[in-house]
Curated annotation (Swiss-Prot):
SMART domains per record: IMPDH (SM01240)
Record gene name: guaC
Broad EC category: oxidoreductase
Xref: InterPro entries: Aldolase_TIM, GMP_reductase, GuaC_type_2, IMP_DH/GMP_Rdtase_CS, IMP_DH_GMPRt
Function as written in the Swiss-Prot or TrEMBL entry: Catalyzes the irreversible NADPH-dependent deamination of GMP to IMP. It functions in the conversion of nucleobase, nucleoside and nucleotide derivatives of G to A nucleotides, and in maintaining the intracellular balance of A and G nucleotides.
GO MF annotation, one: GMP reductase activity
Name of the featured protein: GMP reductase
Amino acid sequence: MLNEFPIFDYEDIQLIPNKCVIKSRAEADTSVTLGNHTFKLPVVPANMQTILDENVAEQLAKGGYFYIMHRFDEAGRIPFIKRMHDQGLIASISVGVKDYEYDFVRQLKTDAPEYITIDIAHGHADSVISMIQHIKKELPDTFVIAGNVGTPEAVRELENAGADATKVGIGPGKVCITKVKTGFGTGGWQLAALRWCAKAARKPIIADGGIRTHGDIAKSIRFGASMVMIGSLFAGHIESPGKTIEVDGEQFKEYYGSASQYQKGAYKNVEGKRILLPAKGHLQDTLTEMEQDLQSAISYAGGRQVADLKHVDYVIVKNSIWNGDASH
């Protein structure tokens, strides 16, 4: 039962260092394998319209990073798969659960993507289970990620239906207001929810939402994630598709949630909002910094690879990690 677990989030946790066994952090291996492919980092940019478009997806794939293309350009998905496969790159797309998506999956038989993510806000649903089974029947070699969920029961059901990985996180993201609009979700206790779900999982978990710092990646791995999906830290780059807006001479980029009126084009069942982020530099600079910070984390863990983060001790420091420094 959940009540047996302490409830905490990222800022409440500090990992405890172990003796370092490598000469330099550059020796630490940050790569991770998901399905049949190995990627440079256990990190994937959120499959949102203001985070990536086809060009960003291509850049990530060429660089050896995992990506998941969003599902908001439905007609463009088959040409996108072809574009990636023509260059010898992996194709990784998203689908919903509406009736027409069943026909779409059948159309993929001639050129199946390596990864499909079933992407809906409340993934513990009969509609998701049915879509997992459909994809597994039509495209048995495609790796299926299903979500989003927030309970061990949901993880078990989606895995039993055939999902190869589950995505955990209901509304902890910076531009998600599910917790406010509905009263439900993992906002404020996402890391504890991840831990709770990971104890039931037999297959990989992707932690999705609530990541505010690079250290949160290491914490996610510690509490059971194989991969970490990140939105806001990947938004606002030069390559990011979001609109650039100037305010008082400063450049900002827009970042909005996948269930916002900005993405939907209509104010109906809205569970996302829009924010402006100060424009950042190049995406590759952030990826490089993430890799270096994760290498440092592995060295603090006394390890050589990502999996070594899973065994470190931790302490719960209720909201004191920033010592009153709210700038973070």
